[in-house]
UniProtKB/Swiss-Prot annotation:
Protein known as: DNA mismatch repair protein MutL
Species name: Nostoc sp. (strain PCC 7120 / SAG 25.82 / UTEX 2576)
Keywords: DNA damage, DNA repair
Family: Belongs to the DNA mismatch repair MutL/HexB family.
N-terminal signal peptide: none
Record gene name: mutL
SMART domains named among the record's database cross-references: DNA_mis_repair, MutL_C
Record keyword DNA repair present: yes
The organism's taxonomic lineage, starting at the top: Bacteria, Bacillati, Cyanobacteriota, Cyanophyceae, Nostocales
Stated role: This protein is involved in the repair of mismatches in DNA. It is required for dam-dependent methyl-directed DNA mismatch repair. May act as a 'molecular matchmaker', a protein that promotes the formation of a stable complex between two or more DNA-binding proteins in an ATP-dependent manner without itself being part of a final effector complex.
Pfam families given in the database record: DNA_mis_repair, HATPase_c_3, MutL_C
GO biological process annotation, one example: mismatch repair
GO MF, any single term: ATP binding
Amino acid sequence: MASTIQALPQEVVYLITAGEVIDSFAAVVRELVENSLDAGANRIVVYLWPQQWRVRVADNGCGMNLDDLQQAASAHSTSKIRSSADLWKIHSLGFRGEALHSLTTLADVEIISRAPENVGWRVVYGDSGKAVHVEATAIAPGTVVTVSNLFASCAARRQGLPTTAQQMKAVQATIQQIALCHPQTTWQVWQNDRIWFTISPAATAGQLIPQFLPQLRPSDLQEIKLEIPNPENPQLSTNNKPNASALALVVGLPDRCHRHRPDWVRVAINGRMIKLPELEQTILAAFHRTLPRDRYPLCFVHLLISPDQINWNRNPAKTEIYLHDLSYWQEQVTQAINQALRISAANIPESVQTTRVSQLLKAAEEKGNYNFNPRNANPADNTQNYLKAVAQVSNTYIVAEHPGGMWLVEQHIAHERVLYEQLCDNWRLIPVEPPIILYQLSPAQVAQLQRIGLDIDIFGEQLWAVRNLPAMLQQREDCAEAILELSWGGDLQTAQVAVACRSAIRNGTPMSLPEMQKLLDDWQRTRNPRTCPHGRPIYLSLDESSLSRFFRRHWVIGKSHGI
């Protein structure tokens, strides 16, 4: 009986491979601009003609000589790696040698390129990736790749693609993601011979994001960059470069910006945006109890780590990877986010007005020099108070002075943040005598109280006795109402938030200056001082220079006004 299993013809193999690598306009743009970045380009121009199924990418990179041009579109040809050992030393965006060859299988491809000190060449490629036409041409150093008649040989592929508008939206998202990882690059994108959008270069990703989200102000973002040891030997000094990695982080400050979906929870590794659900969940967990309900953070994490920590050989688009010691990197990301959310002069140039106040003052954003002492700081450093209590307004807001201006702090939610973090660190239940009697609890309410650790048993018909309670509620007169509130569901953290909220100083409560100062000191030492556990902003800050401009003090300095 003849065998039914046969080797596929080479052209079928290439067509299958091409379909895995190139599946859309966005994939074409992604592969071509990644080649441009690998060539050292810092200016990239993308031309799109979606109705003609044509894409062109031009760059000012290093270009190619004639020998490389003739080989560039051959199957599995690359300048990035030479052996299997090089798979663990990848510093480039591309390395498979499949993209250009796949494009020649699915479209007509032409490349014009010139290396410095050489003449330029134009090469047209056939279906197999071989050069079928070569001619000298005039071109500035760099490369121009034109892909025409995309998917002409795959009518079903064209019909299965989304609408033109959706494809162009995907192209824009792809370019923005790549630009975020390479902020020093200038981008210009044309559609149907008209300029579509541009991206100006920036020193950092944090300076680039407002170009994508115009409603954001630079002061809404906090950006830090940390050197961290590789997990093989975390005890080694980070000054030992071969054993050190870097973590660049941009976060939207939770008291100023958040989103209705997690579309800006993004992770990049070594210049490429990736999908890593474990790290994305780590980011969301780090922002827990800092944002309003059903809101999500703006957070971009870019890990620059040793190539031997990554296995890129998981997905043809290289958007999914295997990352070694994942738990270690999760811990580093959590610590970096916690550091970024603190109010520290070492890492936050504080912008001080909300949009409404900024419009009132008609002043540009200014940077203050605030700081606070984190929980794990040296106790000797805790002697300096960055905020000095001055007064209380409406028995609700604490007016605080600092070297750069003044703050208004709402006393209830500041105290709520302090108590919540204390409860998270030490959830302590104490016996209560006589027991607190509750009436007409449902089985679900009883189960909820038992789930958070309360000792509750039947005391009579429709009566239950609670024999312990959270220590913070001990001195309150409304213990029964507080416990009843805890019975309505939620996890332990929800219960801790409820206890903190009920135990915190009420708005409308007069406070002495020493009491206000102690609250400010305690609040400055919290891990997440910007918002309460419900996500509300705790403070409003006004810097001295903005106040001076509003009162026009700089107009009269030096004149005879006695000022």
